[in-house]
């Protein structure tokens, strides 16, 4: 006899929506949640208080928005769900701007999924340095479904996979603060080849040597 959920999925999993800035991550989160309304599925959205761009709402750059609950940290999500304010008919939890939470969000997401909640998470995959942002690398491992979106490179029009930060027209230094809330005044989406981070350190002793070698090789080829 086939197992009970051979052709359907038991409720309780994690969906991750990620990518660079201007890729439509929040818009996709809102779209998925709005879609559930056709099936009369109730949901609740949380976001970190550090995101000051739209108080008490998650808002996409296309203008769509949803009410949300701001929390100081990930465990507050569990506390709210255990409180008298929580509607027990809610089975879907949305979490936006997940990169601003610490690693405790991974445990929160797993606990929710293990207890029958569908958890839909959105956030940046990389910081301005091009490195995993906050808990995102671990969430890649924990997520049951992953959607990686791209934007359009502001420099060449190719698919953009990185978020570039500039301050007063200058590239942000590798040692600059990781979190700097802002939009187009500081950031643009770029492809790998137009992503610049001055003073980025290299772990391998011969990495810089290889970069110089390859640049010289290309230069000599064009002579």
UniProtKB/Swiss-Prot annotation:
Keywords, sorted A to Z: ATP-binding, Cytoplasm, DNA synthesis, Kinase, Metal-binding, Nucleotide-binding, Transferase, Zinc
Pfam family membership, one: TK
Residues the record lists as binding ATP: 19-26, 96-99
Catalytically driven reaction(s): thymidine + ATP = dTMP + ADP + H(+)
Species of the source: Ureaplasma urealyticum serovar 10 (strain ATCC 33699 / Western)
Lineage: Bacteria, Bacillati, Mycoplasmatota, Mycoplasmoidales, Mycoplasmoidaceae
Protein's recorded name: Thymidine kinase
Highest taxon listed in the record's lineage: Bacteria
Keyword Ubl conjugation included in the entry's annotation: no
Subcellular location: Cytoplasm
Enzyme class: transferase
Catalytic-site annotation from UniProt: 97
